[in-house]
Amino acid sequence: MAHVAEWKKKEVEELTKLLQDYPVIALVDVADVPAYPLSKMRESLRDKAVLRVSRNTLIELALKKAAQELNDSNLEKLIEHIQGGTGILVTKINPFKLYKFLEESKKPAPAKAGAPAPRDVVVPAGPTPLSPGPLVGEMQALGIPARIEKGKVSIQKDTVVLKAGEIITPQLANILNQLGIEPLEVGLKLLAAYEHGIVYTPEVLAIDEEQYISMLQQAYMHAFNLSVNVAYPTKQTIEAIIQKAFLGAKNVAVEAGYITKESAGDILGKAFRIALLIAQELPEELLDEKTKELLNQQAQVIAAQPQPAEEAEEKVEEEEEEEKEEEEALAGLGALFG
C-alpha cells in the first residue's frame, strides 16, 4: 500500500470540514487567474465566502468523504464538474446571488492567443490612434474594413471578429491588443454550485433578472385579478373586492332609481341628463330661461370638441349613402303602387 503524505491527509480533513460547515458549496476554475488578481478576489470575498484552492484529487476525496459523513450522495455529483485548476468556494449566499457576484467581479483582460472568447468580440467603427503600416493589410485579411484617413487607421464599420466560444488566433490577438480591445475576462469561473441536494450549473444560474421580475409581476397581477373576479378574499385583494362590490351595488341602485346616501348624486345626475335630452326635443317657447341657458352651454361644449376630418368625411359619406338608400326605397315603393 502506497504511503500517503501527512499533509495530504490533513488537507483532505480540512477540506471535508469546510464542506460540512457551509450550506452552499461551489467549484470554481482558478487556472487562468494570475496570483495578484486572485489575492484581490480573496479580499472581496472575505465577508461573503471562503475560497480554498487545492489539488483536484484532494478535492475529489474531500467531496466523497463529506458526502459519506453527511449521508448525502448528491454532494458527490460535484465531482464530475472538477476540471482545470479547481478551487472550493463555500458560502451562505444562495447560488444565484453567488453566480451574479462572481460575474460582476470579473475584469477585462487583453487578448491571448489560444484562449476562447467569452462573448462576441466587436471591433467598433471609428478612428484609431494607429499609424499606417502592415497592420492595415492584416486587418483587411481578417475581414476588418480598415483604411487610412488623416494619417491614421480608421475602421469603417462595427465588425464582429470573433463569436463567443471561438479561439483567438495569434494574428487577431495582435490586432486587438494594438487597438486596446480587451476581449477576455479575469475572474473566478463558476463550474457548479450545490445547495440542499441540488447541483446548479452556470446555464441554470445565468438568469435574466429583468425577464423573471416581469414574469413574476405578470403572474401576480393575473392571480390578483382572478382573486378579485371570483371574490376570493386575501390580504392583498380584500380591499379591491370590497370596492368592486360597492361599485356594483351602487350601479344597480342607480339603474333602479333606488335612492341611498351613496347613489342619490348619480341618480339626480342621470335624471338631469335625461331631462336635458327631452328638453332638446321640445319647442323653444315651452322652455324657461334657465333651461335654454343650460342647453346653450351644452351646445357650446359639443361645438368646441374637435372632430377629426376623416370622421367628418365618413359621416358625410354615411349620410349620403343613407339618403341614396332612402331614395331607392321610395322609388321602389312608387313602382310597386303605380
From Swiss-Prot:
GO terms, molecular function: large ribosomal subunit rRNA binding; structural constituent of ribosome
Domain of life where this protein originates: Archaea
Biased composition range(s): Acidic residues: 310-329
Keyword RNA-binding belongs to the record: yes
InterPro entries named among the record's database cross-references: Ribosomal_protein_uL10, Ribosomal_uL10, Ribosomal_uL10-like_insert, Ribosomal_uL10-like_insert_sf, Ribosomal_uL10-like_sf, Ribosomal_uL10_arc
One GO CC annotation: cytosolic large ribosomal subunit
Protein purpose: Forms part of the ribosomal stalk, playing a central role in the interaction of the ribosome with GTP-bound translation factors.
Protein name: Large ribosomal subunit protein uL10
Organism: Thermococcus sibiricus (strain DSM 12597 / MM 739)
